[in-house]
Amino acid sequence: MMNILLEELPHQEQALAAILASFTGIDHAQADHNHYANPLIKERYDDKANIDVKMETGTGKTYVYTRLMYELHQKYGLFKFVLVVPTPAIKEGARNFITSDYARQHFSQFYENTRMELCTINAGDFKVKSGRKNFPAQLLSFTDASRRDSHTIQVLLINAQMLNSASMTRDDYDQTLLGGLTSPVKGLQMTRPVVIIDEPHRFARDNKFYRAIQAIQPQMIVRFGATFPDIVEGKGKNKCVRKDYYRRQPQFDLNAVDSFNDGLVKGIDIYYPNLPEEQANNRYIVDSVTAKKLILRRGSKIAEVGVGENLADVDAGFEGSIEYAGSKMLSNDLELEAGMALVPGTFGASYQELIIQDAIDKHFDTEQANFLRSNEPENNAPRIKTLSLFFIDSIKSYRDDEGWLKVTFERLLKKKLTQLIDDYQRKTLPREVEYLSFLQATLASLHSDNQNVHAGYFGEDRGSGDEAIQAEVDDILKNKEKLLSFSDHHGNWETRRFLFSKWTLREGWDNPNVFVIAKLRSSGSESSKIQEVGRGLRLPVDENGHRVHQEEWPSRLSFLIGYDEKAFASMLVDEINRDSKVQLNEQKLDEAMITLIVTERQKVDPAFTELRLLEDLDDKKLINRSNEFKPSVTLNGETKSGFAWLLEFYPELTQARVRADRIRDNKPASRLRVRLRKENWEQLSSIWEQFSRRYMLQFERSGASLEQIAAEVLRDPALYIRQKPSQVQQRLVSNEDNGRFEVAQREGELAASEFMAGMKYGHFLKQLALRTSLPVNVLHPVLMAMLRDVLHGDSRYLSEISLDNMTRALQTRINAHFAQRHDYLPLDFQASTSVFDSTARQFREEISAEIVGKNVDENAIDDPRSLYQIPPLRYDSVDPELPLLKYDYPQQVSVFGKLPKRAIQIPKYTGGSTTPDFVYRIERQDADSVYLLVETKAENMRVGDQVILDAQRKFFDMLRRQNINVEFAEATSAPAVFSTINGLIEGKAN
């Protein structure tokens, strides 16, 4: 079973830094003797203290607000937080993350000896018992906790409906809280909480749920969300609608455009089966709908449908006994509203079967790519589990043994599996043989009495007595690691990867490895399009639990919909672009566009000004005196609008719109490819013989050895922790607000004397070696000695917590000791890279466009010396990559270009590998050609950037010592690279 490994991502670090920079600080001016409450915050109870954090779906806001609580506790002593979410589903998602072992282990490396106590209030916790009205134990635990316990953070997790319920405001309980209070709300007021709101668009200031938050009198509110509520200002002609931010703008803004363009989420491919024109034009508009009556209109034809009446009586195309159920709902749970279009042809079973078949095909196209990962003889790339999610309209069609959907899906899936098994029985590469076994296990499970290939989760499943259904629900909701794993602890294949739901999983649940979402029903209301694709936006994790970033392995979500939603792609793009910080005005150059251009240009040229920009556009005759774009401008024989020319000359503006390749509409799923100019790459063949060799890190033996460091670190008894098991208490309770039964759940530790069984010694040792990249023979002697002599053979100390402690301690010591004490030892074999096939000993014909560059310039002028066919020109950053790629180099530069990711793969002493950004071949008259490798970095480098530069510098120094004519340069600007090239042409060493 795999373990998810959280990591610090740059955008999450930036969000955290922005929040802390916006925090108003602690008010030390007033004496405070209330140890049950948070310290006093400056500007408390005022919007000046409140903070807004805008983060797009799938970018990790749950991680950020969880870590924020740790930070505020560590730096300022704040220890009581109320986390308010809009729905029970989102509450469950937050609870699962905060209490997960992988999250606790991750945060423990930054906040030692600090634990987070999560108190969750569920429906039914206030239920009267034996005639007494008692407070929930979780509420008492939260309010009564004192700041004298300096190692514990108290978090109360509650959904909006519960916070606004009568149970929270009544004051006739038979127990008391702080100071003799008998009202939960007043008890929370006394704690002076910090409130964190998830999904703030559900909490507009004028609604009852926000008022319920205000009732507990938070000192400070921090809101996290992709969208925020609107506020109307002014009246009549002066009326305007803006986003309701506490300080009129968010303190951190990671919008949808940046999230997609920067590769922080998956790209999206949208598909729908076409309908014959006759069926496509046969559509009914919902003219009006009430609780008892539905009025449909088609042209001049009006049809009235009452409760319980069949839509097939209106049009035979409405197959499947679809009735009007009343309350603005069809019997298939489709929500209706005036103006909606219903296309009868999309309700038929044959049409839905097309979508199912397409989803299965898309699933296995993606699964093969994710499993095989380039599929070469030397294939060490970790596999990626592929999941698919189906939104359906009828539970019976899936849950019943002979349900139409279940029977159809299994029939189509068995057929596909049989075809693939036949194909792979003729293949011989190791990873292909593994995949054949995975397919065979899947088919065998599908034929068994208790198949483990697909599972469903529906709202009606809550409290079900069916053990098989409950096992499915637990796997989907709670066992994320199991769904992401390829095998269990016994080595058996984990074949479950197809999930079915209504809209129950639309929010609060996520799994990063969802690559296909198929909607077999319309979502009805005009909900956010980003929210609909949100379950599949997160970047995937591989079988080792590591997040797989776009530059490492491009990932896309296939989103399958019906013909009636074929405008989905354009609506999604519009929604994303509306979220941009700068809205591009195609009629006139406005102040926001000018500011964006000038700000970006000044990063390269500090002397660039607004006046210089306007003079340039005026000289090119792109704008008139009022800064309006001219409709037609001819330059170099080509005619475009002034706005189109502006985008070409100032591509910085394209950052304000989502890139065209991030969302594709009904196009083939083949990945975008870039063709190599083989004749130019061949000029690099001699140097590539060296680059494609495998290299081993060799550490200096001076000072402490690896054995000594391992011994010093692993002999620390404090690293060895026996893990306490937790117990989950569940009971069926009645929700006072809606009368429905729900499962209330509480988690806590078992008796202190009971500890969980540890890992098997061999497995623990192997995991430690994998995580630290240290040889087993270095770790084994000291680990075995500790277990035998100090821990008295108690294998319970071989826990996940111990493993995490040792990994962190070893990496810290090794990084500090060997940062400058290593070199590269060439090995006697080559290995394939992203651009070179070591088996064929030649460069590839084409490669994935994503690993060359995320951005595209379709109008770049071709240069025959480039490594790729142009146009289009692909790049990652406007500065300094774009000027480097567009520069007219001296004739002595015979080849140049941007290197794709993983083209060389220089090992880093911290693990992983790195590749420089650019390569140049420079011919000199009286000497051999020299090869220049360039790594571009921002002036304000991060620690990780310095590690990359150190690794590359050492690597190329090693090659030079072998008399290989290679030079390395680091640069923060294009002029610095031009200067280096001119120096090399003149025969100067870099």
UniProtKB/Swiss-Prot annotation:
InterPro entries: Helicase/UvrB_N, Helicase_Restrict-Modif_Enz, P-loop_NTPase, VRR_NUC. The lineage of its organism: Bacteria, Pseudomonadati, Pseudomonadota, Gammaproteobacteria, Enterobacterales. Residues 913-937 are annotated as: Endonuclease domain. Pfam families: ResIII, VRR_NUC. This is Type III restriction-modification enzyme StyLTI Res subunit. A type III restriction enzyme that recognizes 2 inversely oriented double-stranded sequences 5'-CAGAG-3' and cleaves DNA 25-27 base pairs downstream. After binding to one recognition site undergoes random one-dimensional diffusion along DNA until it collides with a stationary enzyme bound to the second DNA site, which is when DNA cleavage occurs. DNA restriction requires both the Res and Mod subunits. It comes from Salmonella typhimurium (strain LT2 / SGSC1412 / ATCC 700720). The keyword Glycoprotein does not apply. Belongs to the type III restriction-modification system Res protein family. Keywords: ATP-binding, DNA-binding, Endonuclease, Helicase, Hydrolase, Nuclease, Nucleotide-binding, Restriction system, S-adenosyl-L-methionine. One of its GO terms (biological process) is DNA restriction-modification system.
